């Protein structure tokens, strides 16, 4: 929908996510309606991406540093945690968040196994290649190129990342079937 000409607006004063019907703590956005959408719109136009919200998240974290309550307690997860991201993700700074979770695992005792990879190029769509082709049987590569400037500039690197992700996910699932259950 639209609200005052904006395609998206922040939920103010409430969490986007819940667990066992209880709202989870969250980092509030520093931009209110309609500035929230205008920041996204301006960055999207400036970069040539289908959508670009990274500035929104970066500015929000600068205005409200994430507290311990708002951090996902990754160390409490049982099983394997597979984190995949790309430096050129323009929706949010995935690489920074993966590094933060990796550091958290070093600082807290845990029983889970962490497997992570950060690609230089892969865009926000760091999907396994086979999954992308299932979702978009025709033109999946073209769609990613249309969506993100980085995919236009680095198409082969993005494709190689998706192929590698495909193998990593398959390996993680195969190992989970053998061991973690």
Language model features: what each stretch is:
Residues 87-90, 121-123:
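Acidic beta-to-alpha connecting loop that harbors the catalytic carboxylate
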Residues 90-100, 109, 126-127:
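Conserved alpha/beta-hydrolase "acid-adjacent" motif
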Residues 77, 82-89:
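Short beta-strand/loop motif that positions the catalytic acidic residue
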Residues 105:
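Conserved hydrophobic residues forming the short capping helix/wall of the S-adenosyl-L-methionine
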Residues 1-74:
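Accessory cap/linker subdomain of secreted extracellular hydrolases
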């Amino acid at each position: 929908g639209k609200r005052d000409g904006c395609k998206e607006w922040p939920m103010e004063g409430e969490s986007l996510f819940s667990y066992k019907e209880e709202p989870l703590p969250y980092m509030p956005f520093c931009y209110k309606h309609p500035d929230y959408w205008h920041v996204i719109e301006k960055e999207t136009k400036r970069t040539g991406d289908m959508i670009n919200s990274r500035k929104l998240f970066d500015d929000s974290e600068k205005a409200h540093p994430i507290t311990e309550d708002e951090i996902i307690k990754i160390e409490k997860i049982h099983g394997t945690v597979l984190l995949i991201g790309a430096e050129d993700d323009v929706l949010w700074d995935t690489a920074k968040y993966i590094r933060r979770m990796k550091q958290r695992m070093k600082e807290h005792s845990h029983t889970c196994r962490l497997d992570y990879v950060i690609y230089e190029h892969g865009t926000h769509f760091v999907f396994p290649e086979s999954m992308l082709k299932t979702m978009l049987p025709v033109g999946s590569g073209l769609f990613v190129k249309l969506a993100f400037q980085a995919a236009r500039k680095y198409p082969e690197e993005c494709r190689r990342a998706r192929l590698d992700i495909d193998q990593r996910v398959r390996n993680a699932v195969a190992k989970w079937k053998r061991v973690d259950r």
